[in-house]
Amino acid sequence: YRIASSSIAKMKTAVFLVGLLFLGLVFADEAAIDSEFDQSIDKRGCIATGSFCTLSKGCCTKNCGWNFKCNPPNQK
């Protein structure tokens, strides 16, 4: 009886550790995506307005001001 209860405790511990590992991987992945997104933002205009940049040209949306990275520059 004691052996069975201790093995159940070990299983619970293992499941808990695997769950923690899984959560860690999910959060690490989201952090990586966030940092990549930050790099695609025009530092002068996009952060101030909180708007997204298009990934294709690295241009700001019309909510942002002029973006020197656009070709041609986005002046909407």
Curated annotation (Swiss-Prot):
One of its GO terms (cellular component) is extracellular region. Belongs to the nemertide family. The presence of a 'disulfide through disulfide knot' structurally defines this protein as a knottin. It is found in: Secreted. Negative results: does not show effect on both human and rat Nav1.8/SCN10A. The keyword Disulfide bond applies. Confined to the epidermis and to the mucus layer. The record marks F52 as: Hydrophobic/aromatic residue important for potent activity. Residues 29-44 form a propeptide. Keywords: Cleavage on pair of basic residues, Disulfide bond, Hydroxylation, Ion channel impairing toxin, Knottin, Neurotoxin, Secreted, Signal, Toxin, Voltage-gated sodium channel impairing toxin. Residues 1-28 form the signal peptide. The modification 4-hydroxyproline is found at P72, P73. GO terms for molecular function: sodium channel regulator activity; toxin activity. This is Nemertide alpha-1. Potent toxin, demonstrating strong inhibitory effects on insect sodium channels (Nav) and reduced activity on mammalian sodium channels. Potently inhibits inactivation of insect sodium channels of B.germanica (BgNav1) (EC(50)=8.6 nM), D.melanogaster (Dm Nav1), and arachnid sodium channel V.destructor (VdNav1). Disulfide bonds join C46-C60, C53-C64, C59-C70.
